[in-house]
Amino acid sequence: MLTMNRTLDEKIANIDHVYLSDSDLVNLERFANSFSVRVKTYNLLRDRADEITIRSLKLLAQQYPELVQKQLQRCKYDMSNVIRYASLSVLRDDELFFREALMDWLANIINSYQIAKECSTAYRLLQSVVDEMLPAECAALVKPYSEMAIAALLNA
């Protein structure tokens, strides 16, 4: 059974043997206390994903016009996926989900095209657009995911 939180998922899987520890409860309380901001961030990302993507790619085209011209549809697809997975990861407060579900695969694909540097720039620009378009508290929740994308691409 999947829940909205990885800690709870893990504990439910082992419910016959373990109660939640004080530390687990503190983490769940922190999760619950921040949930309204997480939902707000998820909704904003969902509702503005296309605009965030387009604005980010326009900025990228200023630095890498040939790449964007040749790979526009692929760039849109990849960036849309990153936004979608980041929004769900923010909602779940689950960086591991983001890394396992998307980043390892994406880094390998981008590396095969030999455009990791350019794509890392794209995700830096994406975060700058998010910083402009979302309230600061929401943009701050997205930042670890854009940083993870940048690091995964540069280290691929």
Task: Show the residue positions of the predicted features.
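Core of compact, soluble alpha-helical bundle domains
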Residues: 1-104, 108-120, 124, 132-156
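Helix-loop "lid/cap" segments that line or gate small-molecule binding pockets
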Residues: 129
